[in-house]
Each structure stands twice: as C-alpha cells, then as structure tokens.
Amino acid sequence: MTTESTSTVTAKIPAPATPYQGDIARYWNNEARPVNLRLGDVDGLYHHHYGIGAVDHAALGDPADSEYEKKLIAELHRLESAQAEFLMDHLGPIGSDDTLVDAGCGRGGSMVMAHRRFGCKVEGVTLSASQADFGNARARELRIEDHVRSRVCNMLDTPFDKGSIAASWNNESTMYVDLHDLFAEHSRFLEVGGRYVTITGCWNPRYGQPSKWVSQINAHFECNIHSRREYLRAMADNRLVPHTIVDLTPDTLPYWELRATSSLVTGIEKAFIESYRDGSFQYVLIAADRV
C-alpha cells in the first residue's frame, strides 16, 4: 500500500485502498458531534459507540433542575462505558504481556479502558488521521503511550504479525467493510485460541430485507449494515467459531430513548428506536475463538 508524508502527528498515512475508504476517512476526520465529545469530557474516555443497561432515573433527578442536562450527559456516558466493559467481559483471560487490537478504534476510549483493566498493550486502527492523533494525544496525557497506540490503517490489511494478537474486537465498525475480508484478517493475526468479539447493529433476516429505518441509518453514517446471518457465515469461513451470542437490543433501547430527550440529538435517534421496536434491527454481541 502506498504512503504519503504529512505534517501531522501521524508521520505516514496510508492512502485509502478504495474511493469508499477515502469517503469514510473524510467523514470521520470531519466528525465533531457534541454527542461524542461532550460525553467524553465527563471523564476523558471518548467513545464512538452506544450504551446498554437500565437508566438510573434517581441519578437524573428532576428534569426541571438546572443541572438535569449535565446529569443526562453523564448518564449516557455511563451507559456507553458499560457497553465497553461488557465487551471486555467476553475477551477471555488476558495477561499484561498480551497485545489486543481495536479495529475501528475511534478516539480510543475503549483502548484506555482495556489497558486499565488488563495492563496489556492495545493497538488501535482507524481510517481517520484526526481520530488517531486525538487518541495518541490522550494516551500521552495519561502517560500510557507505551501501551496504547492508535494508527491510521486499513483494518483489512494491518501490520500485525501472523498469530501475534491475543484478542481483538470491532465495536460498531464492521458495517464499513466486507465481513469475509475482515474476519480473514482477524483470523490471520489472532493466535490459535485467541478471542474475537464484536458488538454491532445488524438487520434481522426474519424481517425479510433491511427496513426503511435501517436504510436511513446506512445513509446517515455512509455504511452498509450486514445481516446477523452474514456475520456467522463469514466467521465460520475464516476459522472463527462463535460460542456466545447475546441479543442486546432490549438493553440498548433505554439508552436511545434517553438520548432522544437530550439536547445532543443528531436526527437519527428515531430510526434506531423504531427499528429496534419493530424487530427489523438488532444489537448483538458475538464472541468467537480462533481455531
């Protein structure tokens, strides 16, 4: 893959492998939504995924209170961090000498959480130079840059050695790639017995085809949401054997219903809520072992 020099913190940025990758890089380089940044400001963990769990209405208090919006933002952030913790619960036994990979790492919040939890190295890949620079700057602020690193990289063609990674994950980033290509790459760099975990939204084959709500989500994020069936088929074709599948749809709906009442709405909340309610869209965790 060809590279080009830049003057940013990231010394060399691989050129996009396809025009679509260039589109996605531009999308996330320009993204600065308050719903991501203001939530991250709560405790310095900047996420690019959604939340799970019951809303703590006692912590929110009275909507008429002048501090209510601040409390709502903190509650949304708590639910997003709970989602990341739930993903990490499924990574298996991880030692301090291991290396993990976050494929589609965003601004790096989950990477920081993984290092704090396991004491290991965490490598993140993203198409966005601005995200990588943000994540690396945050790691330096926390003085964990020797253990947590983001890089601009095509997640379908990573620099990691074959069999060198103990566990890896995609957290809401699989809808930007071909699943067979993605799982072939995870299978390549994971050690035998290594763990792969994804949390993702997928359209429900029982609905028949992607609903109008799913189509709206695709258009909003410039992505291509896959069906649940496609995940399982592509994993099986690439020596990743699923052993845990958790339907998180009921657990994420309260997050969306709360977010829809905040000042941070982006206009896509209704599509998520309606598609979860009508069964056309599902939010799932899948954990698989490399064999």
UniProtKB/Swiss-Prot annotation:
Pfam families associated with the record: CMAS (PF02353)
Keyword presence, Hydrolase: no
E.C. numbers: 2.1.1.255
Family matches, as PANTHER family: GERANYL DIPHOSPHATE 2-C-METHYLTRANSFERASE, ZGC:194242
Functional note: Catalyzes the SAM-dependent methylation of geranyl diphosphate (GPP) to yield (E)-2-methylgeranyl diphosphate (2-MeGPP).
Family listed: Belongs to the geranyl diphosphate 2-C-methyltransferase family.
Name of the featured protein: Geranyl diphosphate 2-C-methyltransferase
